[in-house]
From Swiss-Prot:
Protein's gene: ubiB
UniProt GO BP: regulation of ubiquinone biosynthetic process; ubiquinone biosynthetic process
Protein topology in the membrane: Multi-pass membrane protein
Transmembrane domains' residue ranges: 498-518, 520-540
Protein known as: Probable protein kinase UbiB
GO MF annotation, one: ATP binding
Record InterPro entries: ABC1_dom (IPR004147), Kinase-like_dom_sf (IPR011009), UbiB (IPR010232), UbiB_bact (IPR045308), UbiB_kinase (IPR050154)
């Protein structure tokens, strides 16, 4: 460990102790060496005893900086692990940091371009349009055609800082997991690994550009979502250039009302967009918080969304999609047995899970939800409560489902903020039923056959050989089983013969001993003992030498 990393480790420990985060661990889970370590930092005391645990954690992450802020934001979406109070506190964390020097930004951009900025751009604005923990955004115009663009560039040395903090997080999570026990539902090491995957994806701007291009192509003819154009010739690992857009932040309801936006249509389109991305395209924007979503200013009566920041995207397997759709339909049909079966069939929980107990646990959680009208039931909270219940039955964390749950909660919150009367079930049910019918119907079967056709065409020439090999293998297996059976029967015959001789010898020896003790004729007693001894020797020599068959 370098001096620099040791200094950072001390800073983290200092912050943790001054915010009393160690006090949140139950005393029974603190072994003697943990208490000794805590005592060795006796001068660092809890300065925030008046604050609740969730607030202390939020403030500590805020003080530790950008990597921990983003980690806190990610944790706020893990409501299957945290209580609602803690999750809401962490959701308040803001990824806002002071901009870095524009001269450094220029140098970073020119290093990626391999030329001065003025070679390709005019009107480069040294004052950043926005600044976050990972990157910074500047505006300019393309020299070739005068189009307005934004340049997004990574912060200097951000990769080194992120990886150093991730290493500390991983080590801390391993210690915490040891204290809590590996069976604890929090599974800190698993959570940190999930975060590592997310944030490392954000460090590659080229990947973000490719994601944006794919999402843009998926909705190129859509009147519901617009993704800004990426200029691929200027997209690199540490720099991307995209079309500049103008819109109203989706969280600014007053501005949307002022321009006469059809909020009901906008809210319904948000739900439709989510299900289209998940079920039609299997490629969904997984970071749809209000800062990344804008609304068009043109045609407010027929509004569309503008999506930014495609660094975090989610995908599901075909199996996951089918189970998810069936889950929602089973929930609204109150078929809790089917929900439990789906979790087991999908492999999300172990096959040996007690189905009856699992079904009862799901029913206890879900049934009270139906005390509310259907239009007030939250899809996101349904999924969340099901995940929480499944975690009690050792559900393995599915990162793709965590992203989906987070996105669904964002979309629902957004939709109800725009239009409180939004009925998600009525909006989503036709889509889900149509998708399920398509998957199970002739068209769905034809698509699956078409998808698998190239594979089977490639394998077809090998089929006769595979059939022959399997038949030969089966024949050899039968022959080997027959040989084993013959060996087994012969060994059993030997064993029976040996046992017969040994038992007979024992009887004769006993009889000879009795005759001898009764002063009977000596030759009779000696004969019994002698024959018995001979039979014992024959029986011993005829026993099976190797009992393995």
């Amino acid at each position: 460990m370098t001096i620099k990393s040791m200094r950072r480790a001390y800073q983290v420990v200092k912050t943790v102790l001054q915010y009393g985060l160690d006090d949140l661990i139950p005393a029974k889970l603190k072994p003697w060496y943990f208490r000794l370590l805590r005592w060795s930092f006796f001068w660092l005391t809890n300065q925030h005893k008046d604050k609740v645990g969730g607030e202390r954690l939020k403030l500590a992450m805020q003080e530790l900086g950008p990597v921990y802020i983003k980690f806190g934001q990610m944790l706020s979406t893990r409501r299957d692990l945290l209580s609602d109070e803690w999750a809401e506190e962490l959701a308040m964390l803001q990824d806002r940091v002071p901009p870095f020097d524009s001269a450094i930004a220029r140098a970073q951009i020119e290093a990626e371009l391999g030329a001065p900025i003025e070679t390709y751009f005019d009107n480069f604005d040294d004052t950043p349009l926005a600044s976050a923990s990972i990157s910074q955004v500047h505006t300019a115009t393309l020299k070739s055609n005068g189009e307005e663009v934004v340049l997004k560039v990574l912060r200097p040395n951000v990769e080194e800082k992120v990886h150093a903090d991730l290493l500390l997080m991983t080590q801390s999570a391993q210690v915490l997991e040891t204290l809590l026990g590996h069976g604890n539902r929090l599974r800190p090491a698993e959570v940190v690994e999930d975060y590592r995957t997310t944030i490392e994806g954000e460090l590659n701007l080229k990947l973000e550009a490719l994601n944006a291009i794919k999402l843009r192509n998926n909705f190129i003819d859509s009147g519901a979502l617009y993704i800004p154009k990426m200029y691929e010739e200027f997209c690199f690992t540490r720099l991307i250039v995209m079309e500049r857009i103008y819109g109203v932040p989706v969280s600014d309801r007053a501005a949307l009302e002022a321009q006469g936006t059809n909020l009901k249509l906008l809210a319904e389109r948000g739900v439709e967009l989510f299900f289209t991305q998940v079920f039609r395209d299997n490629f969904f924007h997984a970071d749809m918080h209000p800062g990344n979503i804008f609304v068009s200013t043109e045609h407010p009566e027929d509004p569309f969304y503008i999506g930014l920041d495609c660094g975090i995207m989610g995908t599901l397997t075909e199996q996951d999609k089918r189970y998810l759709a069936e889950n929602f339909l089973a929930f609204f049909n109150r078929d809790y047995t089917r929900i439990a079966q789906l979790y087991i069939e999908s492999g999300w929980v172990a096959a040996d899970t007690d189905l009856v107990a699992f079904e009862q646990a799901i029913k206890v959680v879900c049934e009270p939800m139906f005390n509310k009208p259907l239009d007030e039931i939250s899809f996101g909270h349904v999924l969340l409560e099901l995940f929480r219940t499944a975690r009690r039955f050792d559900m393995v964390v599915q990162p793709q489902l965590v992203l989906l749950e987070k996105t669904l909660l964002y979309i629902e919150g957004l939709g109800r903020q725009l239009y409180p009367q939004l009925d998600l079930w009525q909006t989503a049910k036709p889509f889900l039923e149509s998708w399920m019918a398509e998957q199970m119907g002739p068209l769905g079967m034809a698509k699956k056959i078409k998808k698998q056709f190239p594979y089977w065409t490639d394998k077809l020439p090998e089929l006769p050989e595979l059939v022959y090999d399997n038949l030969k293998m089966g024949k050899n297996f039968v022959n080997s089983q027959n040989q084993l059976l013959d060996r087994y029967l012969k060994q059993q015959q030997k064993a029976h013969k040996s046992n017969y001789l040994l038992i007979t010898s024992a009887v004769l020896v006993i009889c000879g001993s009795i005759l001898f003790s009764q002063n009977a004729t000596l030759w009779a007693s000696y004969a019994c003992i002698g024959i018995g001894a001979t039979l014992w020797l024959l029986g011993w020599r005829s026993r099976p030498k190797n009992r393995k068959f």
